[in-house]
Amino acid sequence: MLINPKEILETIQMVRMEHLDIRTVTMGISLRDCSHPDIEIFNENIYAKITSRAKDLVRTTNEIQSLYGIPIINRRISVTPIAIAAESCRSRDFVSIAKTMDEAAKEAGVDFIGGFSALVHKGETGGDLKLINSIPEALASTEKVCSSVNVATTKAGINMDAVGLMGKVIKKTAELTSDRDGIGCAKLVVFANAPDDNPFMAGAFHGIGEPECVINVGVSGPGVVNAAVCELENPDLTEISETIKRTAFKITRMGEMVGREVSRRLGVEFGILDLSLAPTPAIGDSVAAILEAMGLERCGAHGTTAALALLNDAVKKGGAMASSSVGGLSGAFIPVSEDAGMIEAVKAGALSLEKLEAMTCVCSVGLDMIAVPGDTPATTLSAIIADEMAIGVINKKTTAVRVIPAPGKEVGDSVEFGGLLGSAPVMPVSNFSSETFIKRGGRIPAPIQSLTN
């Protein structure tokens, strides 16, 4: 794929006019050597390690931002899942660990820290349960901490006991942050097939197979892709796909260049580049707008899933051509509150929860930043999670749910989080109960396609 001088000028235009940026440079840090039965000593260990490893992250990314003229929006840290690192701690809960992570993130100057996490796709240990039960208070009492729980994999099936528990945890988290529209739930995600090297929040954690310290980069360019599609004159879908592919190539090249330079300057291994198109609430930086530029009157109309499949596939093909270090989630995000076009589609009645669920079959990562009525039962939240986990498990892909049961809100109201988290209209859920199904518990077995050996 040859790049001509005109395309170099186009790249400059992308940064200046079309919201092209590096969404996140995320430093992954292993905390496995910090374990200690005394939780106070454990907290001292993780604070010292996080702050020492990440002390130059913000300064270095600022220097590179100035050098290349490419905006870097967030600097983040991910750590070993705390349920694993703190397993030996003799403590009733892990809230103090979350507070220590928050203090370390503030000292390092980063925007978020992820890894208050547990992996329970086949069952829970004592440490897992301590962490999960600590999530509501942990997220209510911190600013920068993000939490994730993996409850399903294609190889293990779906842990329905954990799914049932997470519905209650989400409700409790919303209640404890009710003064802020339930913002704690915006920092909590439930996964199937969670990746070990995801740079995006709220699901980032430093996986067990990862090195001591690593730099992972997430790019963002919906506005760039939308502009490229809009410039075409009456194209067919093949031409649209080719245009998106070429645009994704340029976006990916830029992201890898920045990531490798950050790694070189910090003396840290470069991990992966996540290709995900991550929208923002800014006008013109929307995944929904790309789908509408393909010919849909509104995102959510019939044909939306097909258009999203085309977009996701073309982004992956262009990105894979540009880098041999593609990882993380690498697809197109469809978070309602973070995408101006999605918000308008919901308000217009074009986009429902059920249609969003269908769209998650062909993209990453799942039902993201969805606001539902505050009186939604915990079992209904668990059932929404179970449906999304089934899509991930059967299709051998990452799926997730980040849902906000907005305290005191009804359908038609909206929640306001500000910043990259944006705002979301409250969407209706089914009035029919899933309680008996969720309370059965147990495990939905792994599908036949898990038998690959």
From Swiss-Prot:
InterPro entries: UPF0210. Pfam families: DUF711. SUPFAM superfamilies: PFL-like glycyl radical enzymes (SSF51998). CDD domains: RNR_PFL_like_DUF711 (cd08025). Gene3D superfamilies: 3.20.70.20. Disulfide bonds: none annotated. HAMAP family: UPF0210. NCBIfam families: PRK05313.1. Belongs to the UPF0210 family. This is UPF0210 protein MM_0081. It comes from Methanosarcina mazei (strain ATCC BAA-159 / DSM 3647 / Goe1 / Go1 / JCM 11833 / OCM 88) (Methanosarcina frisia).
